[in-house]
Amino acid sequence: MQADWKPTASIEQLRQRAVLIANIRQFFAQRGVLEVDTPAMSHATVTDIHLHTFQTEFVGPGYAQGRHLHLMTSPEFHMKRLLAAGSGCIYQMAKAFRNEENGRHHNPEFTMLEWYRVGFDHHQLMDEMDDLLQLILKCGTAERMTYQQAFLTVLGVCPLEGSMAELKSVAARLGLSDIAEPEEDRDTLLQLLFSIGVEAKIGQQVPAFVYDFPASQAALAKINPNDPRVADRFEVYFKGIELANGFHELDNPQEQLTRFEQDNAKRIDMGLTPQPIDYHLIAALESGLPACAGVALGVDRLIMLSLGCTHIDEITAFPFPIA
């Protein structure tokens, strides 16, 4: 039996992909943002309950018993260490790895564009990202709405004040009762409603920036000083596809450590394995992270949309099934 050896993307699509990646690099070069390169493996990893990592083991000299390592889901932690060391504004296009879905919009190994702008808040970063999207997607200016506005407009329920019963009632309307009824975690329920009920209804003509996520979904973002119910976090959607996730970056080491510990406690409650906390990152925050905003963007999805493709395999040479 002959193995399926050919790339799933045409050579012409790969040429166009290369041009778009070159355009992205030029975009940042023109703005004086430094390109960096950080490890694909780490001793620590993300604690987020919704992210699943690949693990490997180093068995070289001095590690006869083996040393567990994680493939990075994002270069974020290493890039923040560079920021704390005085790098200034930085970006990179890195391979990221998530042990999750494989399908039309997902590949376990993918290309991520991540950048950090010193002195920016998340609104200024949204402005810059809007410029990049217009360049690559040839689209109009993005629309913007708060997380609360998106829920109220599309689903008619407030994500910040609505009760669990109200949220489950909306889920029933969407035909999601089997999943929603037994769910006890508010954020998991909100994410279900957002992914099924909201994502497909926004950002159809131009990209949509959704910001002011619930504080309980802050991750590595600051809590909004004017409204502690929400975090200075945004996500970007276009034609039903999530493209990016950005933060006005949290710079308080104790608060960040507490969030990591809370994630791991929740992991234990859910029967998941707690993840090793990145104390190098905590030490970098203690040293002093400059005020900044950062965002991670899925390059493969961006290129797929730019070239009018409907499957990520069309712009990826060797996706997971034939890698």
UniProtKB/Swiss-Prot annotation:
Binding site residues for ATP: R98, N99, E100, N107, E242, L243, G298
The secretion signal range is none
Q: What keywords sit in the KW lines?
A: ATP-binding, Ligase, Nucleotide-binding
Q: How is this protein annotated for GO cellular component? A: cytosol
| Catalysed reaction, written as an equation | D-beta-lysine + L-lysyl-[protein] + ATP = N(6)-((3R)-3,6-diaminohexanoyl)-L-lysyl-[protein] + AMP + diphosphate + H(+)
For substrate, which residues are the binding ones? Answer: S74, P75, E76, Y116, E249
Known EC number: 6.3.2.-
Gene Ontology molecular-function annotations: acid-ammonia (or amide) ligase activity; ATP binding; lysine-tRNA ligase activity; tRNA binding
Question: Which GO biological process entries does UniProt record here?
Answer: lysyl-tRNA aminoacylation
Q: Origin, by domain of life?
A: Bacteria
Record's family? Belongs to the class-II aminoacyl-tRNA synthetase family. EpmA subfamily.
Described function? With EpmB is involved in the beta-lysylation step of the post-translational modification of translation elongation factor P (EF-P). Catalyzes the ATP-dependent activation of (R)-beta-lysine produced by EpmB, forming a lysyl-adenylate, from which the beta-lysyl moiety is then transferred to the epsilon-amino group of a conserved specific lysine residue in EF-P.
Subunit note: Homodimer.
Please name the PANTHER family in this protein's record. ELONGATION FACTOR P--(R)-BETA-LYSINE LIGASE, LYSYL-TRNA SYNTHETASE
Name of the protein in question: Elongation factor P--(R)-beta-lysine ligase
Q: Where does this protein come from, organism-wise?
A: Vibrio vulnificus (strain YJ016)
Q: Upper lineage ranks?
A: Bacteria, Pseudomonadati, Pseudomonadota, Gammaproteobacteria, Vibrionales
